[in-house]
From Swiss-Prot:
Residues 175-189 have a biased composition (Polar residues). GO terms for cellular component: cell outer membrane; membrane; pore complex. Belongs to the Gram-negative porin family. Keywords: Cell outer membrane, Ion transport, Membrane, Porin, Signal, Transmembrane, Transmembrane beta strand, Transport. It comes from Escherichia coli (strain K12). This is Outer membrane porin N. Gene3D superfamilies: Porin. NCBIfam families: PRK10554.1 (NF007841). Forms pores that allow passive diffusion of small molecules across the outer membrane. Non-specific porin. GO terms for biological process: carbohydrate transmembrane transport; monoatomic ion transmembrane transport.
Length: 377
């Protein structure tokens, strides 16, 4: 009986994220759910910047209120707290998500705040590894590729109730920039890597049936003056597109995506290092056993083009094309029940450790093994 319950429950948890949240309040059209997790996590690596304790906790809530029979208000907040530093350490916690919105029956929903960019609608299909993954080109606060500030998002499910399985989203991001180099700046100025000008994006996904889905997304943003004048990528627009496929049925999960970015993707440890173009590929294959074990095999890569980057001793004139991310990943998660799990994730770095480009640009070529024990609710 336990195996059957796990077989039904675990895929639902993976798909819904906080679907197993604890209901705090549900009365008179008002509902509040609390969710969170504690991850006792340790990395093993020859890279001292990664090796060691990585433990953290996350806490969030989702709420909604029924305004009338056609209109619902909602909001979500999620916070991350690191647990691997001293109590006197600074900058060890941050807000991951914080947005509020309105849902208009079959006409869709609109929200504003800190939320996922629409590129992640497709990237999320392959970002399913136990610990690693989702990093060929997506980064938090890098335009609309991951979690981002100041995004207004309209989402529509089943195309106004007319086409089952056809979903789309339209998104606008306001500028977030520092006051320098002729920029007036905004009240939440940040370093050049995390700046962005005004931008927009759209995504669409379609459930093809029998477990198959297809999707695509596109974004285009203005770059700030700092980004145009003080990074290796000189274009005044940052663009990205992606397309993906997934299969999720019969305990099997398969997903793949391809994407390209222009004047957008940072690499290495220098604010100057932004690729003029990247070509990115991710694929993952997973199987959910009835007794709670979920093994996963994945491959991710990002090829940088026209980098104009330091090449190190091997390439004193600099380099233009180079792999920025390239690794295979073997992992497994075991679910004791819906609240407790443990996992191992082995990131096999395929970047050439003998290539001086990586040391010159602060890009690790070392493998990492992650071990985690998770309590979630």
């Amino acid at each position: 009986m336990k195996s059957k319950v796990l077989a039904l429950l675990i895929p639902a948890l993976l798909a819904a994220g906080a679907a197993h949240a604890a209901e705090v309040y549900n009365k008179d059209g008002n509902k509040l759910d609390l969710y969170g997790k504690v991850d006792g996590l340790h990395y093993f690596s020859d890279n001292s910047a990664k090796d060691g304790d990585q433990s953290y906790a996350r806490l969030g809530f989702k709420g909604e209120t029924q305004i009338n029979d056609q209109l619902t208000g909602y909001g979500q907040w999620e916070y991350n707290i690191q647990a691997n530093n001293t109590e006197s350490s600074k900058n060890q916690s941050w807000t991951r998500l914080a947005f509020a919105g309105l849902k208009f029956a079959d006409y869709g929903s609109f929200d504003y705040g800190r939320n996922y960019g629409v590129m992640y609608d497709i990237e999320g299909w392959t970002d399913m590894l136990p610990e690693f993954g989702g990093d060929s080109y997506t980064n938090a606060d890098n335009f609309m590729t991951g979690r981002a500030n100041g995004v207004a998002t309209y989402r529509n499910t089943d195309f106004f109730g007319l086409v089952n399985g056809l979903n789309f989203a339209v998104q606008y991001q306001g500028n977030n920039e520092g006051a320098s180099n002729g920029q007036e700046g905004t009240n939440n100025g940040r370093d050049v890597r995390h700046e962005n000008g005004d931008g927009w994006g759209l995504s669409t996904t379609y459930d093809l049936g029998m477990g198959f889905s297809a999707g695509a997304a596109y974004t285009s943003s203005d770059r700030t003056n700092d980004q145009v004048n003080h990074t290796a990528a000189g274009g005044d627009k940052a663009d990205a597109w992606t397309a993906g496929l997934k299969y999720d049925a019969n305990n099997i999960y398969l997903a793949t995506m391809y994407s390209e970015t222009r004047n957008m993707t940072p690499f290495g440890d220098s604010d100057y290092a932004v690729a003029n173009k990247t070509q990115n590929f991710e694929v993952t294959a997973q199987y959910q056993f009835d007794f709670g074990l979920r093994p996963a095999v994945s491959f991710l890569m990002s090829k940088g083009r026209d980098l104009h980057a330091a090449g190190g001793a091997d390439n004193p004139a600099g380099v233009d094309d180079k792999d920025l991310v390239k690794y295979a990943d073997i992992g497994a998660t075991y679910y004791f029940n819906k609240n407790m799990s443990t996992y191992v994730d082995y990131k096999i770095n395929l970047l050439d450790e003998d290539d001086s480009f990586y040391a010159a640009n602060g890009i690790s070529t070392d493998d990492i093994v992650a071990l985690g024990l998770v309590y979630q609710f």
